[in-house]
């Protein structure tokens, strides 16, 4: 489940930056600043699965780790707790490494992202082609944008992106079954210097490789 969420959820900021509609950018100064100024970043994340609505919200699972990205299409998303797992893309191929199984899954990057939240964070396709974008509410000082996938063949029915003080604060992903995944970001460094081989994936010794 967690792997599906991240393949569906991790990859979205680069595309958003490259293809965001001008009218929407003018409406949100924080977003415009982030879009034009941040070409790469690294930081930490916490991912929570939430069920219910209103006062009946219940956290059913929590995981955390770190991320690095460089637009377009290059990223490392590393789960550290409660289980280790790695998702890494070099601009062409997405690699998913499950340490417990010692197994690597390879997927073509464009096919893996599509109209998923991942495409908003790290992809390179046309945002307006895949999403309807509108301004959302302000909650606890965080300004939200709401994205609705145009494709019916997607796991999520709504995606929220929250900014505060010019920084990406959170993403909120709601699926067709009413479940919500909340990603919160911290310790983000904008435009860090990254080595040339930062996103080169090396298959761990003895790992099985599956291509999809």
From Swiss-Prot:
This is Outer-membrane lipoprotein carrier protein. It comes from the Bacteria. Monomer. Participates in the translocation of lipoproteins from the inner membrane to the outer membrane. Only forms a complex with a lipoprotein if the residue after the N-terminal Cys is not an aspartate (The Asp acts as a targeting signal to indicate that the lipoprotein should stay in the inner membrane). It is found in: Periplasm. Pfam families: LolA. One of its GO terms (cellular component) is periplasmic space. The lineage of its organism: Bacteria, Pseudomonadati, Pseudomonadota, Betaproteobacteria, Burkholderiales. GO terms for biological process: lipoprotein localization to outer membrane; lipoprotein transport. Keywords: Chaperone, Periplasm, Protein transport, Signal, Transport. CDD domains: LolA (cd16325).
């Amino acid at each position: 489940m967690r792997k599906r969420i991240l393949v569906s959820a991790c990859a979205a900021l680069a595309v958003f930056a490259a293809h965001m509609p001008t009218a929407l950018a003018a409406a949100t100064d924080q977003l415009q600043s982030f879009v034009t100024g941040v070409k790469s970043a690294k930081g930490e994340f916490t991912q929570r699965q939430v069920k219910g609505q209103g006062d009946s919200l219940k956290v059913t699972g929590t995981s955390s780790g770190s991320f690095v990205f460089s637009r377009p299409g290059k990223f490392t998303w590393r789960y550290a707790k409660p289980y280790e797992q790695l998702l890494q893309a070099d601009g062409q191929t997405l690699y998913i490494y499950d340490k417990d199984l010692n197994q690597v899954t390879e997927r073509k990057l464009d096919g893996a992202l599509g109209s998923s939240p991942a495409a908003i964070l790290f992809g390179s396709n046309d945002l307006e082609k895949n999403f309807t974008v509108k301004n959302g509410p302000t909650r606890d000082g965080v300004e939200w944008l709401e994205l609705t996938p145009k494709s019916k063949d997607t796991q999520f029915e709504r995606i929220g992106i929250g900014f505060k003080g010019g920084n990406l604060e959170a993403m909120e992903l709601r699926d067709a079954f009413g479940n919500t995944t909340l990603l919160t970001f911290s310790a983000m460094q904008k435009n860090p210097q990254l080595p040339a081989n930062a996103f080169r994936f090396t298959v761990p010794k003895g790992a099985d490789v599956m291509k999809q």
